[in-house]
Amino acid sequence: MFKRTIPLFAAFTLAISPSVFPNYAYAQEDKPKTNQYWWPKMLDLSPLRQPNATSNPMGEQFNYAEEFNSLDLNAVIEDLKKLMTTSQDWWPADYGNYGPLFIRMSWHAAGTYRIYDGRGGANGGFQRFAPQNSWPDNANLDKARRLLWPIKQKYGRKISWADLLVLAGNVAMESMGFKTIGFAGGREDAWEAININWGPEGKWLESKRQDKDGKLEKPLAATVMGLIYVNPEGPNGVPDPLAAAEKIRETFGRMAMNDEETVALIAGGHAFGKTHGAASGKYLGPAPEAAGIEEQGFGWKNSYGSGKGKDTITSGLEGAWTVTPTHWSHNYLQNLFNFNWVKTKSPGGAIQWVPENSNASSMVPDAFDPSKRHAPVMLTTDLALKFDPVYSKIAKRFLDNPKEFDDAFARAWFKLIHRDMGPRSRYLGSLVPKEIMIWQDPVPPVDYKLVDANDIANLKGKILNSGLSTSELVKTAWASASTFRGTDMRGGANGARIRLSPQKDWPANDPQELAKVLKTLESIQNNFNNAQADGKKISLADLIVLGGNAAIEQAAKQAGYDIIVPFMPGRTDATQGMTDVKSFEVLEPKADGFRNYFDKSNNMSPPEMLVEKASLLKLSVPQMTVLVGGMRVLNANTGQNQYGVFTDKPGTLNNDFFVNLLSMSTEWKKSSETEGIYEGYDRKTGKLKWKATSVDLIFGANSELRAVAEAYATDDAKEKFIQDFVNAWVKVMTADRFDIKAANTNINS
């Protein structure tokens, strides 16, 4: 299953050359065999079981936001500034300054973010764990993190590793003369590695992830296994700047960056530091996860010379881009356009470029010996900014307008290190910029009086008497809330963007039916709001969720249970102007097993896509199971298809789906008419009883899912089924409500 990500380009002080790790690592095959090994087609449910809460040593009651808000952030920053220029003998600082190393560390922590599934990014601090801690592109970042340990040790639980890894790079830029636009805390630490689809390759630095048209398979963003973005020497090691530009555009686009942001990031990032390729990669030992226990988490032990300082081997590339590697300047763009560049090789054997003009050979200071000077270098991916016509136009504009470049880089950098954090309401600390940016998916503030319990009861009555069916109300609420992704905290019901482009036109949402439902709900909203004399209002975002809740309460009542589905008002309605249409397009469900919807363009099976959807919603196996069972009997399939509606009382919330699925009175066969559809026949009469998809039948076929389905199919499970369904429903409806904690359901049978 898909989990976290990697996009890629040789960012900052490390650009990685595949040639430097000729025999880096192969996937091992001599381990104990898992069930997945013996039965490769077995549905993998592990995405719904991670992370494991028991792995967290801080305990369930730990409140990171409270801890961070009590932190003296200025003191941390001062300690970081001091650290930048306090060189350690065990890993000497280039030019006496660790700033560029920390920028690279921060970039590589955040730059794994990818738009198609929201995985990757700095949240969680996953650079500490395998595989990221041992990616070739992260070589020697183990030293950067170890340099930070005394500061982490000093401030403890008040600042997470995830926040510290990002803050260090931000402070590094400030300490070297660049003005950032701010920093937000709020990234909580993970305590275990998680499984993420980083690509199909079984060997580091291979690239076998393109489709027949040469495009990266979704949701991947990196072009090579083990790199953050792209091969800095050029695609497949071919030094072609124009071909490199195509790869850069694709991978940075999948990192949520447009062309201008891409140019700003590359040109700004490479204003600092240098690459390291004193010799061949043959001198390097194994990565941290494969190193000896005595190395204590360090990897890439270097047997060349002193193994550090001037003898450092990281990417295989060697040299600095500018004459001021530890001070902000515009020299990167000046050098890029002022020189003609000729191809050469680094001491480590990697392809790079130096000025044709021999007078440039003494421009750049040596990182350790003040008596030595060097020529500036460019990588093939740097030259892409000069020769790609679109990139070149932007880069020249930045060269001619330095202040515009400074602003563009500051904004792109802030976006890079915060893109995976979700809405601005999750930002913590005194350095959060006041400006609201469209990529933060803003929603208006609550500037009115919220509805009370009496209003809620009144509104539910009006909704239920509006002529809208249980199915329509449930489907609309689900379509609105289920866009949420727990990976990057995007989507959800807040904002009511289901009424805006592009969501209102998504096929999964039944656009015509949706328009009818929204029109009715908007009428109820307007009538209520216009009747209030005290400034009280209900948002459409709240009303959509309330409509789904009311329908569920009615459906449970038909089953003999009086329930109240917890509801907390406070959502507001975004405008189209607050919504970046292109940015929201990646949230479109191409499959939603909860609605029995599946677009055949998917490269995964319907059950796999169900697990993926449930994983993004942060659901457990039982929560996924009970939601599917409930949605089926509520007749909530897209297009009103009847697949999996195993009940003769659609619209009644009961456990019929599980009871009938597990009944041995039904024999299932593949449909001879429709691919992917199954038909259930009465074993005695031969009469067709039901039709289903593989998403429906997987709950009887997969042994683990069947165990959960059995729990909901027993005679004494009727009330538990409703209780669990409502709790899971509320979890989805409130997934983006970072201001509240979901309440427990109150059932009175």
Curated annotation (Swiss-Prot):
Extract the GO molecular function terms from the UniProt entry.
catalase activity; heme binding; metal ion binding
Active-site residues, Swiss-Prot/TrEMBL: 108
Subunit architecture: Homodimer or homotetramer.
The record describes its post-translational modification as: Formation of the three residue Trp-Tyr-Met cross-link is important for the catalase, but not the peroxidase activity of the enzyme.
Query: Which residues constitute the cross-link Tryptophyl-tyrosyl-methioninium (Trp-Tyr) (with M-255)?
Result: 107-229
The record's comment on cofactor binding reads: Binds 1 heme b (iron(II)-protoporphyrin IX) group per dimer.
Q: What is this protein called?
A: Catalase-peroxidase 2
Task: Identify the GO cellular component terms for this protein.
Answer: cytosol
What residues does the Tryptophyl-tyrosyl-methioninium (Tyr-Met) (with W-107) crosslink join? Answer: 229-255
- For the ligand (heme b), the binding residues are 270
User: Gene3D superfamilies annotated for this entry?
Assistant: 1.10.520.10, Peroxidase, domain 2 (1.10.420.10)
Q: Where is the signal peptide?
A: 1-27
Highest taxon, organism lineage = Bacteria
NCBIfam families on file: cat_per_HPI, PRK15061.1
The family classification in the record reads: Belongs to the peroxidase family. Peroxidase/catalase subfamily.
Q: Which UniProt keywords apply?
A: Heme, Hydrogen peroxide, Iron, Metal-binding, Oxidoreductase, Peroxidase, Signal
